[in-house]
């Protein structure tokens, strides 16, 4: 089902994360059609609420069942040598998509895996914090990479359970690669500074503050990606000149159009 593109004798398979079912999927037209059908199955409103656990008749469980019936597995793990990590920006009819992309290469079978995650997502931000670790360099061997829903947390104000999405990134020794120290707290401080500045000028509208928060956190993590991570993977060394760009739009409407009630 994966897109394969010949590139210097190797094949590149593209992956993106669909957060409503919590599944890492191959990025291609066949997958996109299945995702669109699964969204119709549960309805737009239910889809936009995001991952809701796997108990009972949850939306995520229904979608996963439909995906499995159409050849898309619920769990995907990748491994290989880390050869690229960089900022990517794509313009589409419904906006500009700001992503982190990173590439693993399995030199034994000549296959490459290019993964795209939205910087606005918790999974994308966690991946950036891990790749910012000084121990991660070009050539670092990754024994296991996956993206999956984390533990739920209940918001008392809305009486809803929300799920962050997590990233597993294990090195050659099988140990989880740690987040770069301090980056998480620096991100919180950057967002607080932006929203506090707005509040100080009299803005207290929830929608305005949420937009400011989202913009601030994307800007912060983009800065970490561009200033700390990208220099570890110079493009001229990678030998990449845009040939690893997936064709067309993302498989799942990108960040899944989360509703405005998600707490920040």
Where are these regions (language model features)?
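Short acidic, low-complexity intrinsically disordered linear motifs used
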Residues: 246-264
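OB-fold ssDNA-binding interfaces and closely related basic DNA-contact patches used
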Residues: 1-116, 128-130, 151-198, 207-219, ...
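Intrinsically disordered, low-complexity mixed-charge segments
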Residues: 230-246
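Acidic, glycine-rich low-complexity segments with interspersed aromatic residues
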Residues: 115-123
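Short nucleic-acid-contacting surface segments enriched for D/E, G, S/T with interspersed K/R
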Residues: 73-79, 123-147
